[in-house]
Structures are given as structure tokens and as C-alpha cells.
Design a protein with these regions (language model features):
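Feature captures the catalytic ectodomains and active-site-proximal regions of enzymes
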Residues: 1-512
Length: 512
């Protein structure tokens, strides 16, 4: 039988970077980590971008990191999944999108595309509009109208005109589509039940009511001239020969191409719910309505283009199915990460899964208490190791991330030192019972606290690699280079002498 327990230790926000300036990880006094990295198998792992299912070059985050670790496979985020489907051609065979096209052909009606027109990548991506336009062209659909919601929050405040110009150039190139209306996201993408705002966007879409302009760009420029930027552009209709270019009518098809649900729900309900009381809508305009993702299961009369796959056979589930006992330990700030996210978005604990929560300190900002609750978390970990009750323990130390977010270098250094002191105590306890441990991080943060270009404080996550260290395992094992977070569960499973389930597509990092 393998060593027991097997501990997965996650040092949240503990990235690795060569430069020492603004690098709390390098500036901190960390003799324990230095010794572990020198004496045990150690490699750098990837925790950002495509390696964790995010767009290339995008910094990792805690939710995505823990999801990938617990799943033992790369979990593609909506943005990446849709972009990938366009690139590999699956997009053009999407059932919901094809049904929307069929409806238009059958009724000789129009296809309306609506959503946030930018490359912000938070709610939508402009390249996805190009994908739908290309699909419409291939399907021989001529009446295609885009209703542009302007961003200015995830993009510069007056960049909307430029995005619409890019879109119009692309429509010309593909040979289909024209802009029919424009609205600031303040109106079209409200999420606080301010129905008076949503009503303005809806009336422009369906009734052609509101301000008018002879072209989308002219209307946006007129708004800029009045010092009203993208987010707040009052909904306007683009006219042709004095009338609205196009409005959404009975038997038309509508594709809402936002992939993030929270700000797409209200407008979708306005189109889809039979009984609607947000404002005086009148009868529902019956359309074939496609949401890019599932905005809300309770919304009626709609289809979903990209359905979220449920993540089966996560590491926690696998342990439970094999009758093994596991503990999850974290302080409040990262408790959801080692439970809900690590379990693939499932709230209920697995059979034999104990959860140990330590309260995070109540301070305004964590630079005021950089050690946070690390010592208490460490005590719980040492207790769990010594109890010999658990086959697997998953533990998260929040400090490098939470204190890193404050951008206060002195505090971040203290945070790193506190955590590394805890690592030392855990290693001692582990050796006493002859257990084994894999140390890693979910993404970087504390190793970069200064923006290299501006010299200003840098408080975000990073794209830097993270440490992978194998402690007190079979000395015949080494770790391979080039691994990512999805490879961790398969590694632990091999360490425990078990067979990796088929659903896990990550690859063990162990080499003999």
C-alpha cells in the first residue's frame, strides 16, 4: 500500500518569477521552501492561459485553478470553448444555431444577433459574432441584423465606435449583415432589475423606438460629442430612408451571443417569458431565441447553443468511490475553492469527505494582518496528518494571494514567510507518519507586486509558472517538465498506486 496520507498543499497565489524587484516570494526569507526545492523533485508548472482552459496569455484565477486540479482535466471556460469550436468547425454544425437558421429560411424572416460588441472577453467576444455571420453566409441567409451593445467597462470607455467599425468591415468582407441598433450596456445589460433601462433597449430592438441615426458610427459619435461614452449610449435605431433598418418581428430568429449569464438574463426574459411584468411589454413577440449559454434554467421559450458539461469523476468523487477518506482544509477566503470548485462545481461533500473551515480574520484589508489565519489552518492540517484518519488531505493557504491583492510589498513578504513557516511544520508532521505531499499553487500573484512598465503597484494575478514539489514520496520518482494543474490529480492517483479514471485526461507528472 502507498504512503498515507497523501497531502495536496495549495499555496494560493505563490508564483515563480526570475526578477526580485516587487517579488515578495523572492524577497521573503523562505529557508523551508528553498530546502524542499533543492532536496526533492521540483519543476515549474503552468497555471494560466490555454493550460487551464483560458484564452492564451490570460492570467489564471483561483476558481479555474481549483476546478482544473480537482477535475484532473483541462476545463475549457466558455470563451475558450466557443472560440475553439469556431476554429475547429464544430460551431458551424451547432444544433441550436442551425435551427435558428432553418426557422429564418422556412419563414423568409430575419436573423438578429445581439450582444456586447468588444473583445473584452468577459461577457462576449467580437470574433464570435464573426463566426455567426460566417454561419449565416454559409446557410444562404440574407437578412442578418446586428444589434450592438457597447462596452466601455471591460474595454476603454470610448472604444465602441472602433469595434463597430471593425464589425462593419467584417460584414462587408463576409458579405452579410448590417447594424440595426446600438445601445450602451447600461441599458441592454442591466442586472439589478432596473427595468426602465431594459425597456429602452427592448423598445429600440422590437419597436424601433428611441433616438435615430443614419449610421451606427454616426450615432455613436453624436453620443461622444455629448460626452456620453460607450456604457451609457442611449439606445438608438439605425434608419434607412427614414424608417428603422430592422426590428425583431414574429417568426424571426434571435441569437444572444453573450456567454456570461448575469447581465444577459433580464433582456432575455423580456423576449422569452410568457408572463412578464418588468414593464408594459404587451404580448411576447414569438421568435426562435438562442442563448449562447444557459443564462437561467427558468427562462422559457429559448434554446441554448453551448450547454455546460457536468464534470464527472473528479478526484474527490474518485476517492469516495474507492472508499477512501479525505479532508479539505482552508480559511474562509478559500474554503469554496477547496470544496465547491475542487469538486467541479458541486456543493455537497463526497462520501467520506470531511471539511474543516477556519474563519478568516475580520480586518478591512489583509495587509493589516498578513498572516491571516495561516497558523490556525496549519494546526488543523498537522492534527489531520497525525490523526492518521485520512487517506488524502487537500489544504489551501490563502495568504500569498489575498495579501498580494493589496499590492503592499512588506505585508506580502510577511504573508509568504508565515505560509512557508507552516509548510515546515506540515513537512515535519508528514515525515513523522511517513506520508507524502505534493506542493503547488493555483496561479501567481505575490511574486509580482509592481507593474514593470509603469512602476505602479500591481495587484492582479499573473501568468507566471508555479512550483510543483513532490515531498517524501518514493525516492525513485522524479517530476516531468511542462505539466499543468490538470496533471495533479492523475499524479496523486499514481502516487497512491491506483488507476486513473478515463474521464481524467490530465497526465501524471511522475517519471521513474
Amino acid at each position: 500500500m502507498s504512503k498515507k496520507p497523501t497531502v495536496l498543499m495549495i499555496l494560493d497565489g505563490y508564483g515563480l518569477r526570475d526578477k526580485t524587484e516587487g517579488n515578495a516570494v523572492a524577497l521573503a526569507n523562505t529557508p523551508v521552501m528553498d530546502k524542499l526545492m533543492a532536496e526533492y523533485p521540483f519543476v515549474k508548472g503552468n497555471a494560466s492561459g490555454l493550460s487551464v482552459g483560458l484564452p492564451d496569455g490570460q492570467m489564471g484565477n483561483s476558481e479555474v485553478g481549483h476546478m482544473n486540479m480537482g477535475a484532473g482535466r483541462i476545463i475549457y471556460q466558455e470563451l475558450t470553448k466557443i472560440t475553439k469550436s469556431i476554429e475547429d468547425g464544430d460551431f458551424f454544425e451547432n444544433k441550436a444555431l442551425l435551427a435558428a437558421c432553418e426557422n429564418v429560411k422556412k419563414n423568409d424572416s430575419a436573423l438578429h444577433l445581439m450582444g456586447l460588441v468588444s473583445d473584452g472577453g468577459v461577457h462576449s467576444h467580437i470574433t464570435h459574432i464573426y463566426g455567426i455571420l460566417e454561419l449565416a453566409k454559409r446557410q444562404g441567409i440574407e437578412k442578418v441584423y446586428v444589434h450592438c451593445f457597447l462596452d466601455g467597462r471591460d474595454t476603454p470607455p470610448a472604444s465602441g465606435k472602433e469595434y463597430v467599425e471593425q464589425l462593419e468591415a467584417k460584414m462587408k468582407e463576409i458579405g452579410v449583415g448590417e447594424v440595426a441598433s446600438v445601445s450602451g450596456r447600461y441599458y441592454a445589460m442591466d442586472r439589478d432589475n432596473r427595468w426602465d433601462r431594459v425597456e429602452k433597449a427592448y423598445k429600440a430592438l422590437v419597436a424601433g423606438e428611441g433616438n435615430t441615426a443614419e449610421s451606427a458610427t454616426a450615432g455613436i459619435q453624436a453620443s461622444y460629442d455629448e460626452d456620453v461614452t460607450d456604457e451609457f449610449v442611449v439606445p438608438f435605431v439605425v434608419t434607412k430612408d427614414g424608417a428603422a433598418t430592422a426590428t425583431v418581428k414574429e417568426n424571426d430568429s434571435v441569437v444572444f451571443f453573450n456567454f456570461r449569464p448575469d447581465r444577459a438574463r433580464e433582456l432575455t426574459r423580456t423576449f422569452c417569458d410568457d408572463s412578464f411584468d418588468g414593464f408594459e411589454r404587451g404580448d411576447r413577440v414569438k421568435t426562435t431565441f438562442v442563448c449562447f449559454t444557459e443564462y437561467d434554467a427558468t427562462i422559457e421559450n429559448k434554446t441554448v447553443a453551448f450547454v455546460k458539461e457536468s464534470i464527472t469523476n473528479t478526484f474527490g468523487q474518485f476517492l469516495a468511490d474507492n472508499g477512501l477518506k479525505q479532508a479539505r482544509i482552508a480559511e474562509t477566503e478559500k474554503y469554496a475553492h477547496v470544496t465547491f470548485f475542487f469538486n467541479g462545481g458541486v456543493e455537497e461533500p463526497n462520501e467520506g469527505e470531511d471539511r474543516i473551515l477556519v474563519k478568516s480574520p475580520k480586518v478591512a484589508t489583509y495587509d493589516l494582518k498578513p498572516e491571516m489565519s495561516a497558523y490556525e489552518v496549519c494546526d488543523k492540517l498537522v492534527g489531520a496528518i497525525k490523526s492518521e484518519n485520512y487517506d488524502v488531505i487537500v489544504i489551501n493557504f490563502a495568504n500569498p494571494d489575498m495579501v498580494g491583492h493589496t499590492g503592499v510589498q512588506e505585508a506580502a513578504i510577511k504573508a509568504v514567510e508565515a505560509v512557508v513557516e507552516c509548510v515546515g511544520k506540515a513537512v515535519e508532521a508528514l515525515k513523522d507518519v511517513d506520508g507524502q505531499m505534493f506542493i503547488c499553487a493555483d496561479h501567481g500573484n505575490a511574486e509580482q507586486l509592481i507593474d514593470e512598465e509603469t512602476g505602479e503597484p500591481f495587484t492582479a494575478h499573473t501568468t507566471n509558472p508555479v512550483p510543483f514539489i513532490l515531498v517524501n514520496a518514493d525516492p525513485a520518482y522524479k517530476l516531468r517538465e511542462g505539466g499543468c494543474l490538470a496533471d495533479i490529480a492523475p499524479t496523486l492517483i499514481e502516487l497512491m498506486g491506483m488507476q486513473q479514471p478515463a474521464e481524467m485526461t490530465g497526465k501524471s507528472l511522475l517519471v521513474k
